[in-house]
Swiss-Prot record:
Keywords from the named record: Ribonucleoprotein, Ribosomal protein, RNA-binding, rRNA-binding
Lineage: Bacteria, Pseudomonadati, Pseudomonadota, Alphaproteobacteria, Rickettsiales
Source organism, top-level taxon: Bacteria
Primary gene name: rpsH
Designated name of the protein: Small ribosomal subunit protein uS8
Assembly mode: Part of the 30S ribosomal subunit. Contacts proteins S5 and S12.
Source organism of the structure: Rickettsia rickettsii (strain Sheila Smith)
Length: 132
């Protein structure tokens, strides 16, 4: 079965794993997925992730993060820019998501980064997803 949107598949797997209270989730690996996971880890939404090779296919396993009382660190995670409709934004047009409690993840000429980092570097780009 071929997927047309690998990033949306990854986000859906993470969202469903949090709803099921799983400790970890795995999916096929790619460079863009790894870049998004780097941002999520840096922002404190996931614990860690590792990439493993199995039958010549790379898989990424993500260790999910929960609070002390068992609440998920990610309440919402949604794809913004889709293969059929790309969404680009200048940095001045990106306002804080959920009053700066959430983040946008952007693909910029300087790599994949959060909206906070993009504000510091004063660069816009494709809005991949939003996380709260």
């Amino acid at each position: 079965m071929s997927m047309t949107d690998n990033v949306a598949d990854m986000l859906t797997r993470i969202r469903n794993a949090y709803k099921s209270k799983l400790i970890s989730v795995s999916f096929p690996s790619s460079k863009i997925k790894t870049s998004i996971l780097d941002v999520l880890q840096k922002e404190g939404y996931i614990k860690d992730y590792i990439t493993t090779q199995k039958n010549n296919i790379s898989y990424t396993e993500v260790a999910l993060k929960y609070s002390v009382n068992g609440d998920a660190s990610i309440c919402e995670i949604h794809r913004v820019s889709k293969p059929g409709k790309r969404v680009y934004s200048a940095i001045k047009d990106l306002k804080g998501y959920y009053n700066n409690m959430g983040i946008y993840i952007l693909s910029t000429p300087y790599g994949v980064m959060s909206d906070r980092e993009a504000h510091i570097k004063n660069v816009g780009g494709e809005v991949i997803c939003k996380v709260f």
